[in-house]
Amino acid sequence: MTRYKAIISYDGTLFSGFQRQSQARTVQEEIEKTLQKLTGGQGIQIHGAGRTDAGVHAYGQVIHFDLEQKRDPEKLRFALDTQTPDDIDVISLEIAADDFHARYHKHFKTYEFLVDIGRPKNPMMRHYATHYPYPLDIAKMQAAIKDLVGTHDFTGFTAAGTSVKNKVRTITAATLTQDPKTGFLVFTFSGNGFLYKQVRNMVGTLLKIGNGRLPIEQIRLVLESKNRQLAGPTAAGNGLYLKEIIYEE
């Protein structure tokens, strides 16, 4: 068996998420169906570094899979890229070490979240940025976002009912900028792992701080109390992008 590692991007608008689900269109299912065609009917399972939700996009998702026959990586990449649906792009593909695992090999992820603060909103970007038409103090949010950096228990920022027991994660960078061309707000978070809906809950809280409905100290309060009820609402998934995954050597 030969293990392959690929970097893929996708428009999440018409997907019910990355992970295979019954009676729902997913990124995993589409790639596995294409691999099955390319291998003459073999059942191939792919493994992703992250399980993005419905409507969430990716610039740099990483997957791995095993094939019985060794294939030329570029020819395989081209075949996958041209035979998967148009909302999936196979950026690169290479032979990986036998013990490489896209999800469990130690890595750092970067997520980006776009917020359209225009009044009126940009209808062409409705699937690619979350609209927030209310007044915002950007400087306030830029000050508050710094409290997320470091190693914390992020229980207060994860969705209820998550099965993950250890909710301690490290965020190495958290920034908020404004795109000079579009005027969109760009939230960027990098870290060693993120809990279910963590990024969307952090953005929802920051927007509420910027709107003056939560104090600037609320991020610290949520982290210290581990109370989801003190955080803001979950921001919509359409503004979220899995931007990059970097593996340790």
Swiss-Prot record:
GO terms for biological process: tRNA pseudouridine synthesis. The keyword Cytoplasm does not apply. Keywords: Isomerase, tRNA processing. Its EC number is 5.4.99.12. Substrate binds at residue 111. InterPro entries: PsdUridine_synth_cat_dom_sf (IPR020103), PsdUridine_synth_TruA (IPR001406), PsdUridine_synth_TruA_a/b_dom (IPR020097), PsdUridine_synth_TruA_C (IPR020095), TruA/RsuA/RluB/E/F_N (IPR020094). It catalyses: uridine(38/39/40) in tRNA = pseudouridine(38/39/40) in tRNA. One of its GO terms (molecular function) is tRNA pseudouridine(38-40) synthase activity. The active site is at 53 (nucleophile). Belongs to the tRNA pseudouridine synthase TruA family. Homodimer. Formation of pseudouridine at positions 38, 39 and 40 in the anticodon stem and loop of transfer RNAs. This is tRNA pseudouridine synthase A. The gene is truA.
